[in-house]
Amino acid sequence: MVRFKQTSEVLKIMRNIEQIRNIGITAHVDHGKTTLSDSLLSAAGLLSEKIAGQALALDYLDVEQKRQMTVKAANASLYHEYKGKPYLINLIDTPGHVDFQSKTIRALRVIDGAIVVVDAVEGVMTQTEMYLRVALEERVRPVLFINKIDRLIKELRSPNEIQQRLVQIVKDVNTLIATYADKEFQKAWLLDPMKGQAFGSARDRWGLTIPLVQQKGIKFSDIVDVYTKGKEAVAELQKAAPLHEAILDMVVKYVPNPRDAQRYRIPKIWHGDLNHEAVKYMMEADPNGPLVMLVNDIRVDPHAGLVATGRIYSGTLRAGEEVWLVNARVPQRVLQVSLYMGPYRELADEITAGNIAAALALEKARSGETVVAMKYKDSMTPFEKLRMITESVVTVAIEPKNPQQLTKLVDALYKLHLEDPSLIVKINEETGEYLLSGVGTLHIEIALTLLKDLYGLEVVASPPVIVYRETVRESSQVFEGKSPNKHNKFYISVAPLNEETLRLMSEGIIVEDMDARERAKILREQAGWDADEARRIMAIDENLNMLVDMTTGVQYLREIKDTVIQGFRLAMKEGPLAMEPVRGVKVVLHDAVVHEDPAHRGPAQIFPAVRNAIFAGFLTAKPTILEPILKLDIRTPMEYIGNISTVITKKRGKLIEVQQMETSARVIAEIPVSESFDIADMLRNVTAGKAIWGQEFSRWAPVPESMLMDLVSKIRTRKGLKPEPPKLEDFLSP
């Protein structure tokens, strides 16, 4: 393998912003993202041409190589010449499987263009649509590569049919662009095959665009003939139409440079004061301005420690310089600066605005951190939080086979969470078990494999269980919560938040850290809130619950405001029914009595008082359990629709839509996550292995009333609690 053949050129080009492109590759699982990456690496001199297409170079973990799938988002900086001019292509290869989509979504924040890879036979699938939707919401411009033309030729053969199939895929992608892109980009970003969207075979390393077809005098019938003549003919096609030429030429031509992209992306992804000095530097991607960087990825290097990777929006990241972490609110000194080449980091003295860089020694940085020059320490608003589409709803209890390795396990779990925040680690206070939650069973399996491969830990894991949510369906009366010393009282009611409010929060339109007047205006106009209540929001938590302060003139309340908010957050983490997280509840503080002496109003007094009042209201407001629901997108021959319908019904699911396509059908359905563990085997069995499908998290839905109390009892028993939920009297003040 030839490593870093052009690193010196790369470091030169990164100073010229017009010659930089930041791109990602997104697709449904197994549509060929990493195979495409290999070919691009090969062309850049970073991978032997002989093994490109098979190496999976950006899949650098053992588990990725073994499973032939991408688990992490991997970076590489590539050198490419277009019309005699050198360009730096900062490339991120991302996972396609639904269980790892948080990594893809984080990558979309720091790129300006996305190569959307679509399997020519399978077409646009669930994850294709989901990632394209998020990309468009982030104002990331899509370009298209229709892959696996070799497979399409074997199935269709006719050049005319192949062309019709390609046109249909372009139409499907354009429909999504017209649906999800902001109005100002809907027409400009529509794909036009005549202008250069690419098609080809990543495995066989050839690619073409219509302009290249015309330029090289290649006909569709010529391509079909190649696959009847054998390997030598395919090798000739590789030489005549190299894949990297079609793809990277398309990228240079249609993906904007960082400066042009930041001018329209900054107002979308950064919601601070647009009159702030930093804005003009970010809009121009000015390398001479103060540093502003967004961290999108954290890796734990066994030798170097924590490595924070992100996009520099303004200024220059230099080794040895002190910077400020806005979310963590701490200064840190950058030890080293480097750019990524797959699993390798190449050191640099400095990296300028518009580029993707890795920094060593930012030990307090986490994914989503905003890193700025020290001069912005007190004035910088962090970048908007990323909106995650999935939720971590599958949990296993784990313990080391060797009890002496418990400390090592705790450290390893902490590091896995740093790298992947959607892996959530908790300790069951009742049983002392370590609980690991992930998006799905594969997510958990990969985490357990990493514990073994990276940290040498053999662990025992329980069967997977589902994480539920608790909520209320009615408003409660006001209840009193009294502190243990009887000196502090809180008068609280609870109510369900309406669907529009939940939508605004889940889409990141309403957040805790935003201008209160702007938030109140949105709640009034779009969610029907009372004007007074809309102005008085104290806190919003991660599970879409709100705390509203409707008190007037309560002495000393301001002094304990943070403690009250913390008490609210703790109560929302474990509800009264089954100690599951609470979702979609409005907690209203109507009145309070607060002791004048700080010694009598500490957290030990305030937390239980707030919790008891909330839980008393909760139990009288028609409480219920919400279960996570999956959306299934199934492509199947027509004759299997009845069989699929039967499986969905058995799984407590429902058919949402059945669409007839050219030679098959598309079935959209929903099933509870709790019923999904064997769905793959069942669908394969009833369709003779001829169906293909994808899945994604859809929504939270109340469990059927007939199952509610039995489910509550099972959850509580599993957690080592009494089977019966607490009674109202348990939370009433004596």
Curated annotation (Swiss-Prot):
Binding-site positions, GTP: 27-34, 93-97, 147-150
Residue positions where Diphthamide is found in the record: H600
Transmembrane segments: none
Pfam families the record matches: EFG_C (PF00679), EFG_III (PF14492), EFG_IV (PF03764), GTP_EFTU (PF00009), GTP_EFTU_D2 (PF03144)
InterPro entries on file: EFG_II (IPR041095), EFG_III/V (IPR035647), EFG_V-like (IPR000640), EFTu-like_2 (IPR004161), P-loop_NTPase (IPR027417), Ribosomal_Su5_D2-typ_SF (IPR020568), Ribsml_uS5_D2-typ_fold_subgr (IPR014721), Small_GTP-bd (IPR005225)
Location(s) in or outside the cell: Cytoplasm
Keywords from the UniProt entry: Cytoplasm, Elongation factor, GTP-binding, Nucleotide-binding, Protein biosynthesis
Span of domain tr-type G: 18-259
Broad class of the protein's primary localization: cytoplasm
Family: Belongs to the TRAFAC class translation factor GTPase superfamily. Classic translation factor GTPase family. EF-G/EF-2 subfamily.
Role noted for this protein: Catalyzes the GTP-dependent ribosomal translocation step during translation elongation. During this step, the ribosome changes from the pre-translocational (PRE) to the post-translocational (POST) state as the newly formed A-site-bound peptidyl-tRNA and P-site-bound deacylated tRNA move to the P and E sites, respectively. Catalyzes the coordinated movement of the two tRNA molecules, the mRNA and conformational changes in the ribosome.
Protein name: Elongation factor 2
Source organism (scientific name): Desulfurococcus mucosus (Desulfurococcus mobilis)
Gene that this sequence comes from: fusA
